[in-house]
Amino acid sequence: MANHKSSLKRAKQDIVRNTRNKSRKTALKTITKKVDALVADGAAEDAKTTLLAAQKLFDQTAAKGTIHKKTASRKISRLTRRVNAAAK
């Protein structure tokens, strides 16, 4: 365990940030799986509406620095391609 006051504070902040980031990443994985499940079921309209929510969540998470901006863009792009392919 940390001995200095500043390192104790840092350790506490790390725990809080770790928890927050883990929650955000879990939400991203969940909504991605939800979109994929809707695509697999053939529910194209539901998949499109869920895709919009997923895009918003990816952009917000990237803006907060939990994931990189280009990672968010890549994942949104791949999700969009899957949804568009299912709509055809």
UniProtKB/Swiss-Prot annotation:
Gene Ontology molecular function terms on file: small ribosomal subunit rRNA binding; structural constituent of ribosome
One of the Pfam families matching this protein, by short name: Ribosomal_S20p
Keyword field: Ribonucleoprotein, Ribosomal protein, RNA-binding, rRNA-binding
One GO CC term, this protein: small ribosomal subunit
Gene3D superfamilies (alphabetical): Ribosomal protein S20 (1.20.58.110)
InterPro entries in UniProt: Ribosomal_bS20, Ribosomal_bS20_sf
Record family assignment: Belongs to the bacterial ribosomal protein bS20 family.
Function: Binds directly to 16S ribosomal RNA.
Name of the protein described by the UniProt record: Small ribosomal subunit protein bS20
Organism from which the protein derives: Desulfosudis oleivorans (strain DSM 6200 / JCM 39069 / Hxd3) (Desulfococcus oleovorans)
